[in-house]
Amino acid sequence: MAIDLVEIEANTSVLADEFISHRLGLIPLNSKNVDDVIYSRDCDCEQYCELCSVTLTLHARCTGDEIMRVYARDLVVDPLRANQWVGNPVITDPEGLGTVICKLRKGQELRMKCIAKKGIAKEHAKWAPTSAVGFEYDPQNKLRHTDLWYEEDAAKEWYVG
């Protein structure tokens, strides 16, 4: 499952609608019992329906003076959905917040409806199985993942002209 369609009703944040839509598409969604959802290409509906999609809503408004972060946990699955597990954002951080979608300042608002569909990675990368990805800077290549050159002494090795 991944968010495929985003209907933005209000976006007064500094981020463009397309940027937020792209971020939403990459948020991992729970796919437990995803077999209850059929592929949209196999469905008889026009665009989406209850059989081939899950509807999520997001409404966040910053009323205080502090910067407000909008998290994946703020995405709410349609309460009328029979299977409540499918489509919920996967939240693995200890605080239980999930991925940051955007930040809002006082008076800014984000209101949208998201449609999550079942798909395969051959169609789009958002349907690829994901896991946590880490990055650590290794300036001296001590882990020896590659046989790249690294500088011993920048002052001696680089020409100053």
Regions found by a protein language model. Name each.
Residues 1-161:
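Protein-protein interaction/assembly regions in multi-subunit complexes
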